[in-house]
Amino acid sequence: MDIERVNENTLKLFITYNDIEDRGYSREEIWYNRAKGEQLFWDMIDEVNTEDYFDVEGPIWIHINASEVGLEIIVTRAHILKDGETLDGHSNFDEHKEMFAPFDEVGDDLLSQLTQFGDMDESELFMDTDIYVYKFKDIDELIPVAKRMTDELVDSSLFKYENWYYLVVDFGNADEELNRHDRNAVIKEFLTPSNFTIHRLEEYGEKIMEFNCFETVRKYFA
């Protein structure tokens, strides 16, 4: 598990599904078995819940980003003052208390978010953005895509993470919205849409081709 201290009151935790399996859990268990998911959360919290490192006491706020390769959990302590103000940027705790969970109930919030993620199809996780990510197993799967994606206005890069290749396509310079959707449809004929973000790939993945992925594949593989 990777631990990053964002500031005095906030930690960012990231754990891959491989790490989760090493702890004796499966992806299906943490998505659909509330008890197992809660137990995993407490295991993670126990590792950081020390006075010297990050003493979790009282209400905390959590934010979960669940991806196909792991979980990113941001934990923030909510220090509540006598007048109801907090030290984490919320001016009035009563107005924002739905964003917080007592330390002994936070597992329920985690599980509800994981369950929602587990019920979603990956294609439904695309957001309205210029950057799309696709995954595939063999580099040969990229060749027919590269042959059809000859538009120089489309930026592309290639990453590898845990035996999967990830194609990142930036449609920001595409001429029209319709053309963007058409190109996306072409790529989806051969590759699988992924909810993995470019930021996570840059942080944990291996960069294979930083620029002009389609042009490079056509030149050396097609």
Swiss-Prot record:
An example Gene Ontology molecular-function term: protein-macromolecule adaptor activity
Subunit comment: Homodimer.
Organism: Lysinibacillus sphaericus (strain C3-41)
Superkingdom of source: Bacteria
PANTHER family given in the database record: ADAPTER PROTEIN MECA, ADAPTER PROTEIN MECA 2
Coiled-coil spans in chain: none
Written domain comment of the UniProt record: The N-terminal domain probably binds unfolded/aggregated proteins; the C-terminal domain interacts with ClpC.
Protein name per its UniProtKB record: Adapter protein MecA
HAMAP family on file: MecA
Similarity field: Belongs to the MecA family.
Function: Enables the recognition and targeting of unfolded and aggregated proteins to the ClpC protease or to other proteins involved in proteolysis.
Gene Ontology biological-process annotations: negative regulation of establishment of competence for transformation; negative regulation of sporulation resulting in formation of a cellular spore
NCBIfam families: PRK02315.1-5
Designated gene of the protein: mecA
